[in-house]
């Protein structure tokens, strides 16, 4: 009987710990403010906003973006005692999504659903996530940025020039990209995966311990790693490639016509293809 009671207690503790681990906490401004714990009564609220071309998420909200014609829309689904603590507004052509100042909250679910005809900028500062539900097509340049531990995911991007960056421990995972010039940068311990890319020119840099993986095709590519990070582009076919490593990081690339390599430190550059080489041997 005692063993059974102990087993039941253990199971209850496991479920309790799991439930707690699913909660998110956010505090802005005064940490001494009383924490608002989300209720179990969930509501949906439509928020009227002006036109915007950029989305900026601060803090921990999760955002789903859908590209569609018509007026822009914002719909929030969360607990009834949390919803009025959000600060959602359009300023300088940017939709800002976050919490009001001096807020201390604990919640389990906060979904923000956003729709607009066009975007040219997407950014996350904090631990929030953005999901591009049906991709994004624009004739403009497009900037995608994560600063912090948040994530941006999606598939089906078509734009002019594209700039994608991670600063911190966040992740960006986007598939099926068509653009003119692609610029990729990872600073910190974050990771980036871009699959099935079609680009004219590509520039990719890693600073720190993060990594980036790119697949697809490009005409020219310039790669650099400073630190212990890794750049995996052996599945990204390029005609002409320049690759440099400073530190202990690594680059794996794919060049068909020409490859220039420079290394400083213990880092390495590996390649596939049969290009003309400018690859001085270390003395």
Label the model's feature ranges.
Residues 1-283:
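Intrinsically disordered, low-complexity terminal regions
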